[in-house]
Amino acid sequence: MKELTLKYGCNPNQKPSKIFMEEGQLPLEVLNGRPGYINFLDALNAWQLVKELQDATGWPAAASFKHVSPAGAAIGLPLTDTLKKIYFVDDFDEPLSPIACAYARARGADRMCSYGDFVALSTTCDLQTALLLKREVSDGVIAPSYTPEALAVLREKRKGTYNVIQIDPTYVPAPIEHKQVFGITFEQGRNEVHLTDDALFADVPTRNKTFTPEAKRDLIIALITLKYTQSNSVCYVKDGQAIGIGAGQQSRIHCTRLAGSKADTWWLRQCPKVMNLPFKEGIRRADRDNTIDVYIRDDHDDVLRDGVWQQFFTEKPAILTREEKRDWIAQNTNVALGSDAFFPFGDNIERAHKSSVQYIAQAGGSIRDDNVIETCDKYDIAMAFTHVRLFHH
């Protein structure tokens, strides 16, 4: 098949719409549903990300995409009991497969932003992963293959309309890519930079020059994630998964703040006071996610005031105070941070430190590099200048 007609483009008024190949066949097949224009943008960006993550780490990988940026990305490291609980996957009797773990991590890191996502899997979608996908609100999934049992489950999702795409994992695109804006064609070489080389960590200007193997792995995950995130972007990673992604901000510090806030929320969800919230039986996942998100923030009264808390809880929870939140966040350790371009000022490092960042990889090259290095040294943070910019538009 050389082309696939779509219902419409970005918006319903943008017709006609299609995806096509000028030469050869499309390297994908729609196994179920009718994916749209934005679905394919998400699917193809997400597929590149997870394929590159698996190639770089040797682990199956998954990503959760919304509006052409990842809400989450992860490799399939085993889940702790705490993560199983906050990701709502603690009801499986058998240990989760690596690809199911990767999906649970990618989907669970930022559940608010992953609502209605498009998912990418780097390897075969098995039955466990399909069962996890089935119970989440999602637009579709792309993977190189599906077990028959998994495909049967996914074909039942969303009254049979769930989008399932199979992609040829051996497909390699042309080295030159094109796009049109306002009738004008842009051409550039594909971004083929490889983010696995030890050269990424060869230039370490900070006093602390120690990167553990786990830190290097997490920084590589951060950089690969940023390679497929709308710029400007910053990514916090811990234990093989993105825990906070700040995408599409015009200011670097706003990226760092946004991603840091998401990372803090991820960590606060593991606080015993949050994990033991007395939710009513039968509350929907989306309502639980929204309620936890508000409870953690300073506007917690939106779910705790009289006449409201009764909708969600069996008894009124105590407030999670600012002091409790600060103390809990301080217990986080060994967070890695990547940036798609240089940090212009040390304020980014100050904000990163508040979210327990210990390792940083960024391009370097700011006229204020000295200020950034000095701020890292102030907190004994190890920072590498990669000399690689990762803008994505």
Regions inferred by a protein language model and the residue ranges of each:
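Flexible, glycine/charged-enriched surface loops at secondary-structure junctions
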Residues: 56-64, 164-167, 231-238, 268-279, ...
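Bateman/CBS regulatory modules and CBS-like beta-alpha motifs in cytosolic regions of diverse proteins
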Residues: 124, 203-214, 343
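Glycine- and Gly-Pro-enriched alpha-helical subdomains that act as flexible
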Residues: 71-112, 243-342
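Active-site loops and adjacent core secondary-structure elements that bind or stabilize anionic groups
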Residues: 1-197, 215-233
